[in-house]
Amino acid sequence: PVVPAAHYQCGGIVVDLDGKSSINNLYAAGECSCTGLHGGNRLASNSLLEALVYSHRAAADVIKRVGAIEFNTNVPEWDSEGTVQPNELVLITSNLRELQNVMSNYVGIVRSDQRLKRAMDRLRIIYGETEGLYERTIVSPRLCELRNLITVAYLIVKSAQARKESVGLHYSTDYPPVEKLIS
């Protein structure tokens, strides 16, 4: 069946005009960054130009500063003592599907306080189960990706819960669009 799908995110890592974040030596450009150029919505073709401009500006800034950056090469080897091979990969797959369903059903195009609360409740359960897997199994890319997706989902829901108006693509049935508040 044809269903809505998230193919980009509005928001992300807040950066300055050179793509610098608030974390020293961390730059962001493209879909992961929040430049402020889009306002309350994202125009379809603008993201490509934004990515090109900000990646160019970030690269130019890094080139100027690269000689002064200190790199820590003393990183300890991974210690997997006390962990086991994951015998239950189906748990990772199941949690990923559940996460996708929660975000699609409750944090999609139309939102409400009730849906967001339900999403947060489910996210806490998925988080707890996933952290249990992380603590006792050898780390895998799939498990790390799931943990990252849960973190992003949590941040999206938390931010949506803090918003008390409907602006651009941030629409809630509980709050009128800003245009109606102004008129």
Show where each model-derived region lies.
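Short Gly/Pro-enriched turn/cap motifs at secondary-structure boundaries
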Residues: 2-5
